[in-house]
């Protein structure tokens, strides 16, 4: 794996409406992409609590809520409301219609 590499993961047209996620892969890493309030966010697609896919959750007030266990994960920094555990977040760039994530 090439750390700090930018990888194209999706097109803007593939994103769901605000608050819903999609699952993508970047160099073998599962990533949940969310569009929220005009920005694209990328979070590792694993809930820090029980390991369920965050891409199946919904976003409310800047946090993805895991659809399996109800944990809240901040899209900006990966912090969790209930514990000190964190989800990994990835920098995102939108280049034209393409979404790129730095891993």
Language-model-detected regions and their locations in the chain:
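Short, glycine/charged-enriched secondary-structure capping and boundary segments
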Residues: 61-62, 81
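Flexible, gly/pro- and Lys/Arg-enriched active-site loops
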Residues: 80-86
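Short cysteine clusters
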Residues: 47, 66-69
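N-terminal pre-ligand scaffold of iron-sulfur
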Residues: 1-61, 75, 88-103
């Amino acid at each position: 794996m090439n750390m700090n590499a930018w990888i194209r993961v999706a097109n803007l047209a593939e994103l769901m409406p605000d608050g819903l996620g999609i699952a993508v892969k970047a160099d073998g890493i599962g990533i949940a992409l969310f569009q929220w309030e005009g920005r694209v966010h990328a979070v590792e697609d694993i809930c820090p609590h029980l390991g369920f896919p965050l891409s199946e959750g919904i976003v409310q007030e800047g946090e993805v809520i895991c659809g399996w266990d109800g944990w809240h994960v901040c899209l900006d920094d990966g912090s969790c409301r209930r514990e000190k555990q964190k989800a990994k977040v990835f920098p995102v760039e939108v280049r034209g219609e393409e979404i790129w994530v730095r891993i």
